[in-house]
């Protein structure tokens, strides 16, 4: 097939509830959106899904299957992004906040949730239970955006307008957040971690740096430390520095911390 417009498929509400993004989540009647750079792996996942009686597979031209249930779209990337509107039709009107750093993401996210109020939802390392009914995939610090929007599209989650996300280096490196824009992002710190994936500190830092690009964020907050200042040197976005320096945008003092804890 050449280019595809999802509206041509006239999905029912039941179809949309059965949208999935992994062969692990396929059940009879599922509509699977899937792609992979490795053709053999893609064919394997598609074959697994067909055996599970998937209703429809929407994939890229990279797939070899000629099964009638498989639609191969030349414009798969556009089609996949369009699926987000079906999962959560108001997702673009929500405010997103991203937090990255080796340590402190979870704590910062929890504080931010309290500051932003009851319309706020924090998604990160410890929120695996939120996704237990969404996907059978292993919970990630930064879940797939597809699954996040599937969660936000559920009636119980429609009330959340401020979405706070832990942004892991893996997720940023794999472009897992493509499709949303962060109102404000934050950088906490950086130390040696995940070298099994990134191999060195510079690759690790460059993955984190993606969050502070024009493609993903409008502005950001950073801590006055070695790597925070490197973020500021490498990003052209408006920024706010948190420091004990009296010239900082946001002043941090031990007295202020003591007052908060008392």
Where are the model-predicted features located?
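Switch II (G3) loop of P-loop NTPases
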Residues: 162-170
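Acidic, Mg2+-coordinating active-site environments of NTP-dependent enzymes
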Residues: 59, 63-68, 158-161, 173, ...
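P-loop NTPase switch/communication element
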Residues: 128-144
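Conserved helix/coil segment N-terminal to the catalytic DExD/H
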Residues: 171-177
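N-terminal leader/targeting and accessory segments in enzymes
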Residues: 1-82, 86, 262
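Walker A (P-loop) phosphate-binding motif
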Residues: 86-128
């Amino acid at each position: 097939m050449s280019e595809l417009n999802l509206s041509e498929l006239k999905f029912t509400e039941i179809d949309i509830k059965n949208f999935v993004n992994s062969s692990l989540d396929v059940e009879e009647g599922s509509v699977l959106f899937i792609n992979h750079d490795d053709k053999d792996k893609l064919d394997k996942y598609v074959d697994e899904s067909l055996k599970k009686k998937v209703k429809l597979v929407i994939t890229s031209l990279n797939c070899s299957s000629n099964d009638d249930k498989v639609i191969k779209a030349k414009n798969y990337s556009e089609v996949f992004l369009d699926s987000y509107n079906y999962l959560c039709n108001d997702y673009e009107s929500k405010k997103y906040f991203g937090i990255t750093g080796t340590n402190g993401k979870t704590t910062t996210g929890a504080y931010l949730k309290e500051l932003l109020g009851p319309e706020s939802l924090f998604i990160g390392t410890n929120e695996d239970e939120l996704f237990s009914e969404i996907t059978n995939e292993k919970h990630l610090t930064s879940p797939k955006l597809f699954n996040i929007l599937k969660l936000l599209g559920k009636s119980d989650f429609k009330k959340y307008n401020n979405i706070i996300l832990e942004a892991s280096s893996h997720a940023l490196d794999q472009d897992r957040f493509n499709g949303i824009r962060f109102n404000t992002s934050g950088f906490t710190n950086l130390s040696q971690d995940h070298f099994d994936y990134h191999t060195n500190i510079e690759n690790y830092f460059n993955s984190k740096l993606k969050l502070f690009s024009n493609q993903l964020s409008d502005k950001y907050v950073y801590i006055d430390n070695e790597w925070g200042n490197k973020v500021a040197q490498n990003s052209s976005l408006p920024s706010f520095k948190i420091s004990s320096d009296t010239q900082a945008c946001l002043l941090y003092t031990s007295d202020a911390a003591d007052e908060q804890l008392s």
